[in-house]
A protein has these predicted regions:
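Terpene synthase/cyclase
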Residues: 2-4
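Alpha/beta enzyme core
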Residues: 7-439, 445, 505, 509-526, ...
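Non-catalytic helical/linker scaffolds that mediate oligomerization, partner binding
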Residues: 243, 278, 463-469, 543
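Substrate-binding cleft of secreted/luminal carbohydrate-active enzymes
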Residues: 429-462, 469-502
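C-terminal functional modules
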Residues: 476-543
Length: 543
């Protein structure tokens, strides 16, 4: 949000001046302008301030999407505050605004990268406090990005540059975060307590899934077990109560269903009357008709349409759903969640197929017309292969000769310049636009991009650095790219807060301050504006 820095500075300046007058000479060392600068550079004082601010942004964006599906939003998953900071700095640099660009906190990455137990699978085995801790860390880094950029602008203003308008219209790096609470880490009270911590850390949107908490699996793996709707609704209520208690009245709940790929349920809900929610859930459970004399000791029996049936129960006590019931269960999950307090939906799917997603969402919209989806553009999908397969089937249906393609080997590089590859890549490129328009997708996210980019970059750097290229691998592949692309971290001392700290030391100690940013600081080598002066000096010396 813009146009607040100026009023913030003026208000802070007046406040400090009044305080100095109130407390007299004991405050003589406090410079009103310096204090006002520090207030301006730290707009958000608490995580709750952030949650309220970002919730309002999401609500506005949701309304904009309802009016025009071109107004969809996006995010990338981040596993460290620094990663989130660099993402938002890059967003501002390349796109000139943070509008409709969010952050995503993935439970998968918390488990894999942030647990004190070491790397873990996505099964809710990591300590639950790691989730709010990461949210807090992310917003600490984003607030520092604000402070660094504004500090630079104030320095330029002091040096006579005309940057007042940039200060007055400064856009914060703080954006909404959709935070993954898995299945709630326990019962509804546990969900409520953890949600409070996440909101207090700054989260305005909580994503919760309908799996059994202590048997949770990654949405793209087998063995998923879902809970009856009554249990899930209790957790939706717990999240809403947490938002209301903390004064984040616009807080967003994202209800995720894993039913598309889940074939098991842990327990059978109690139906109070035919056709109620529990009855609808029980209708999906696979059962075999039996006579009363065929029942075994301790069998669980149900009466269905006047007949006795025995639910199919596995050796571990779990009950099995009917084959082919998954899509109907997804639709019922979504409708039920929206009718019981959820704001957005999340449907885990086996492949990224717009038409398949739209088929489910459109059924939901028949009951809840403004239903909107958060969709996981997951790295668990082989995007290249999925879309080449889709296009292969389309081209075949169009009557094209496909004998030149091996359907079992479409990932082969030999097809990279083919018509099939061109059409597949075009569909990947427009997937998010198409999904927003046709499948009700309000928010597109990639859960684990920075997990994969870290691995890829280390693969590329180590190949050359420990090989024939040596130091050139780093210089050519990293530093030179940072310089030429204007990546802020090329001056890593500044990004870590060194210049900001020097400014603070000057405020605190005046001329006695021992600062890091002097002429002997090697970061000066990256100051492009000084290069012509150095070259000129060398030429004059040679002459």
């Amino acid at each position: 949000m813009k146009n607040l820095a100026q009023s913030k500075y003026s208000s802070a300046l007046e406040t400090v001046r009044n305080l100095k007058e109130k407390y007299g000479t004991s405050w003589n060392a406090i410079n009103s302008e310096s204090a006002a600068r520090m207030v301006t550079q730290n707009r958000f004082k608490t995580g709750l301030d952030i949650a309220k601010y970002t919730a309002a942004i999401m609500r506005k964006d949701m309304a904009a999407y309802d009016a025009d599906t071109a107004n969809y939003t996006q995010s990338l998953g981040c596993w460290h505050g620094f990663v989130a900071q660099q993402k938002m700095i890059a967003v501002k640099k390349h796109h000139k605004t943070t509008s409709k660009k969010y952050l995503y906190l993935s439970g998968w990455m918390v488990a894999a990268l942030r647990s004190e137990f070491g790397p873990l699978p996505d099964q809710s085995m990591h300590e639950k406090t790691a989730v709010p801790s990461l949210i807090s860390e992310i917003y600490d880094f984003l607030r520092q990005a604000d402070a660094i950029e504004l500090n630079d602008l104030f320095k330029r203003l002091e040096n006579g540059e005309d940057v007042q308008d940039q200060i007055d219209n400064f856009e914060t790096h703080i954006v909404p975060i959709i935070a993954d609470i898995d299945a709630g880490f326990g019962n509804e009270e546990a969900t409520y307590l953890l949600t409070k911590k996440m909101i207090e850390a700054g989260a305005c949107a909580i994503q919760i899934e309908n799996q059994v908490s202590d048997a949770k699996q990654c949405g793209h793996q087998d063995g998923k077990v879902t809970v009856p709707h009554e249990d899930f609704i209790a957790k939706l209520n717990a999240i809403r109560y947490a938002f209301l208690e903390l004064g984040v009245d616009d807080g967003i709940i994202v209800a995720r269903t894993d039913s598309e790929g889940a074939g098991l349920t842990q327990k059978l809900p109690v139906s109070q009357e035919p056709g109620d929610l529990a009855s609808k859930y029980l209708a999906f459970v696979e059962a075999e008709e039996i006579g009363i004399n065929d029942a075994k000791e301790d069998d669980v029996l149900l009466k269905r349409e006047g007949k006795l049936v025995r639910p199919v129960r596995l050796a571990n006590g779990l009950y099995k759903f009917k084959e082919g019931s998954n899509i109907d269960r997804v639709v019922l999950d979504c409708i039920t969640s929206l009718q019981n307090g959820a704001d957005l939906l999340w449907i885990e799917t086996p492949t990224p197929n717009v038409q398949q997603i739209a088929t489910m969402v459109n059924r939901v919209k028949e009951v809840v017309p403004n239903a909107k989806l958060v969709y996981n553009n997951s790295p668990s999908f082989n995007w290249t292969l999925n879309f080449r397969n889709q296009v292969f089937e389309e081209m075949l249906a169009e009557g094209e000769n496909m004998t030149g393609y091996d359907l079992n080997n479409l990932m082969d590089e030999v097809y990279d310049t083919s018509e099939l590859s061109y059409r597949a890549d075009k569909k990947i490129k427009t997937f998010q636009v198409d999904g927003a328009r046709e499948a009700g997708i309000f928010h597109h996210l990639i859960t684990l991009p920075t997990y994969h980019t870290t691995a890829l970059h280390m693969n590329d750097l180590t190949e050359g650095y420990f090989g024939e290229e040596g130091m050139l691998a780093y210089v050519k592949g990293v530093q030179r790219q940072e310089i030429r692309k204007g990546v802020s971290c090329v001056k890593h001392q500044r990004m870590a807060g060194s210049d900001l700290g020097d400014a603070h030391k000057t405020f605190f100690a005046g001329d006695k301050a021992l600062k890091a940013g002097g002429t002997n600081n090697t970061s000066n080598q990256f100051d492009v504006s000084e290069k012509p002066k150095k070259v000129k000096a060398i030429v004059e010396k040679v002459a």
